[in-house]
Amino acid sequence: MKRARMRTSAGRKDVRTAKTETAHVAEEVRARLRENEAIAHLEIDVESVSKGRAVFFMEVQSKHKQMHGVVHGGILASLADTTAAIAAYSTVPAGTHIATVELKINYLEPVPGGRIRAEARVLRTGRNFVVTECEIYNESGEMAAKALLTFGATAGHSLERA
């Protein structure tokens, strides 16, 4: 297991697992996502969050499926967007707002059901943009979709139009 080293107030090294630290961050993110009605409706949940990375999951339900009995592509895109956004937020200064400016997704396998998992990582954080990728896996562990996302980043003010 990966370990994070931290200095105590006495200057000695204190070893804590990265898993414990990310569990705390994941719980904070989970609470914020519950406030978002769209995410709450989709029932997207957090597995882990660390700097530049996020892993989310979703249990497929009938409301996620299109008429052919597989998960709708827009649902997979929403899962990728949400997961990648949290990974992006983890790399920008506090008070920075981000918004998706581009999302490209390739659907590789149909997803008929089960638990799907999204893994996002930041490829580059610049002054105005954050570029990420997100892979979505079906219950069997096969990659079902791959997305490349770019987020615009603005420090200190809201992205809402006046």
Where are each of the predicted segments found?
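Terminal targeting signals and extreme-terminal segments of soluble enzymes
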Residues: M1-A162
